[in-house]
């Protein structure tokens, strides 16, 4: 197959949802339909307890939530689909944001009993930054749901995106009978499939067919016809250009748990979602059709293989083809490296990649030299932009139970901060170690991983820090004066960047007023 054909058949997407909307179930069912796993919801390990394929960290196993982002590749409809799993728990980290910089489209999963929830709103704001095309799956039709028309209205008004229903539900809960495909004029009748059973779906042609009345009952058939008249009058038709621009979302109804409707949105994804897209660098735009290799690191994850103390850097291939043993330029450090053992992912199963194309995600073994945001090329000096680092909103001082392990603690914290799991600050005036996070759960993750991966027992204490900003200044003399007068508020982060840590927002505002020549940054490019 030629290079353009390989690139054109790739689709790279992430699933976004509020916790408990059914994202983990959908992820499994997508893999099931892609024949990538045999039993949904399980990797039967030696302990024979089932763990979802994409949840591999110890704490995730205990809590049943997907904290880290994994990558899964599977074939579907003559396409190769890369699914990036994003954390679905109550408070998520920058990992989620950064993962969304590595995809070309997203599937938004909504719990049809609840409608649009707060996390979904937050994630949609992130996809807006790059006008990412969005498909929508209204989940849990096997339960009692809100009025479907009301759900569409809510998505339109709250998320500011037009809805184009592709399928329409017939009943819900115990009365759920299936969905009607508007463009194809076909009804797909619901039979619950459990676990890894995908039922053969019975299809009824035509909305006026007596077979439809016989299958779902006169009342529901008539209700469907009435609702469709309303829908066709009140909602939008699917418009591919508006979808690609992130202005309109095709909407599918189904139940992931009942293995129903998942294939409809997969068909939509492979048919409509964009092939790998161009990306901006600080020098020029790189097109996916270019044959020279380039890519950027959007995530670093430690210890994916408990048997090996390794760290893997996840790289999105932007252009060209990766081949085993190829020489690439690691732009930030200006060094050429030979990559002979990159990984491809089927969650939990890591295979060595012989080749990878634009749109694919590969894993590079990292011994501390690779950072989030790093660019790799075949020689060209450029840096991909738009991979953010956010100023944390929560801070704690971290302290050792055994003071002799200070070295391991620092090593662990710096590695976890390079991974983006948390940020670490070392104040200039003392030997404290302050941990900053975007969400509370990150603190638990850090303590649990320090214990299991670095054999360090640590505890947190309250610390008088309300917020942090990265500081820079073009005038060296003024910067020195600022540093001299504010030493008690300055710290170095994990990458040795100077940071202003403020005990209150008032303190920060005063500092910004007092030093107009100093730039205080809330986000920083990696």
Swiss-Prot record:
Keywords: Cytoplasm, GTP-binding, Nucleotide-binding, Protein biosynthesis. Belongs to the TRAFAC class translation factor GTPase superfamily. Classic translation factor GTPase family. PrfC subfamily. GO terms for molecular function: GTP binding; GTPase activity; guanosine tetraphosphate binding; translation release factor activity, codon nonspecific; translation release factor activity, codon specific. GO terms for cellular component: cytosol. The keyword Cytoplasm applies. HAMAP family: Rel_fac_3. Increases the formation of ribosomal termination complexes and stimulates activities of RF-1 and RF-2. It binds guanine nucleotides and has strong preference for UGA stop codons. It may interact directly with the ribosome. The stimulation of RF-1 and RF-2 is significantly reduced by GTP and GDP, but not by GMP. Its main location: cytoplasm. CDD domains: RF3, RF3_II, RF3_III. This is Peptide chain release factor 3. InterPro entries: EF-G-like_DII, EFG_III/V, G_TR_CS, P-loop_NTPase, PrfC, RF3_C, RF3_dom_3_sf, RF3_GTP-bd. Residues 8-277 form the tr-type G domain. It is found in: Cytoplasm. GTP binds at residues 17-24, 85-89, 139-142. GO terms for biological process: regulation of translational termination. Gene3D superfamilies: P-loop containing nucleotide triphosphate hydrolases, Peptide chain release factor 3, domain III. It comes from Actinobacillus pleuropneumoniae serotype 3 (strain JL03).
